[in-house]
Amino acid sequence: MTDSLDNARQQARAWLAANVPSGPPPEEGPASRAFVLAWQKRQAESGWAGVSWPREFGGRGASVLEQIIWFEEYARAGAPSPLDASFVGLNHAGPTLIACGTAAQKAFHLPRILNGEALWCQGFSEPGAGSDLASIKTRGRLEGDTLVVDGHKIWSSYADIADYQELLVRTDPQAKSSRALTWIICPMETPGLTVRPIKTMAGPHKYCEIFYDAVRIPLSNVVGGLNNGWPTAMSTLAFERGTASVALMIGLIRKVEQLLAACPADRAAMRARLAGLRAQGASIRAMAYRVALESADTVPDASGSLVRLGFSEFVQEVAAVAIDLFGLDAPQVLRSHGLGYEYLDAFSETIAGGTSEIQRNIIAERLLGLPRGPR
């Protein structure tokens, strides 16, 4: 490691040691919103917000290696999950605006995302269109200088506490597939928009469904142009290297190590199973590093699906082993190790963000060059 990278690590470690909030964050509602915004503001005030964003837009402009170092130290310091309610704004909406937004859109929204003044959610998936976004039905009808939106979105994380939504709608019913979509900025307080939290067995609600009944959005909120929503949404890939997954992997590996330490010495088979998981986690982390570094100067390719598939299934395996280890005492012990929610939510990991089946198709077709399967 070079002196500059070592210095970056020491700076990150020192700042995190002095600033990471103590205790678990609130699980939902207004208290959760206030916590996320305050933590984001604290990072922004010290120049640690938006580490991957270009400096000209208020970010840190960190290299891929510097981003990896930041997220390594972030995880080791026990900082709040990078997948909290700030994730969509920092990793999806913000980068999309940087790539495709107008000067006015950038000037208004980017500082608010970075400085902890506004939260964003995503309005892509629908009850009949999750993995196949090109088939969405929510419609944006053009009326003068306004889009009138009617439809239904689902599985929108933190929509109940968000200020804005990156919304994908169908604006040309005659066009085929993705050529009919438009990416728009949707304020969550717009009349006609209703948010309903979805309760799951995991407890605190994270997911929501959203209903649109003649929601009127000005054309000035269109990003990337009418009927150009698909390439606009894909533009995020030019910034996203998956470096935030490093923090998630390190956090999960640490929990495996905690389970290993709690496993009695006479349970040799279970200890071997946990040791195998520890090695598996290390290999996925190494793969995440490699994918991030190889895409440093290019738009990331389908290699990210390797990391996504490995991580999502690793989460489920860790949760299953923890249950086997503690048996009837598992609910109480898992909570003490911070794994209670992870176990109950683990089943969604291989569905959200692209199912394992879709990730395997991407790997087969785009990386291995195998024939495309039937659709």
Model-flagged regions — what are they?
Residues 1-87, 108, 112-115, 268-277, ...:
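Amphipathic, small/basic residue-rich leader segments at the start of a protein or domain
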Residues 3, 193-283, 349:
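Glycine-rich beta->alpha junctions and the first turn(s) of the following alpha-helix
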Residues 24-30, 264, 268-271, 282-337:
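C-terminal helix-coil-helix/basic helical segment that borders enzyme active sites and/or dimer interfaces
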Residues 65, 69-73, 92, 232-235, ...:
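Glycine-rich phosphate/cofactor-binding loops in nucleotide/flavin-utilizing enzymes
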Residues 82-104, 130, 146:
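N-terminal glycine-rich flavin-associated loop
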Residues 116-124, 168:
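A short, Trp-centered hydrophobic/proline-enriched beta-strand micro-motif
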Residues 138-141:
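A structural signal for short hydrophobic beta-strand segments in well-ordered beta-sheet cores
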Residues 146, 150-196:
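A short core secondary-structure module
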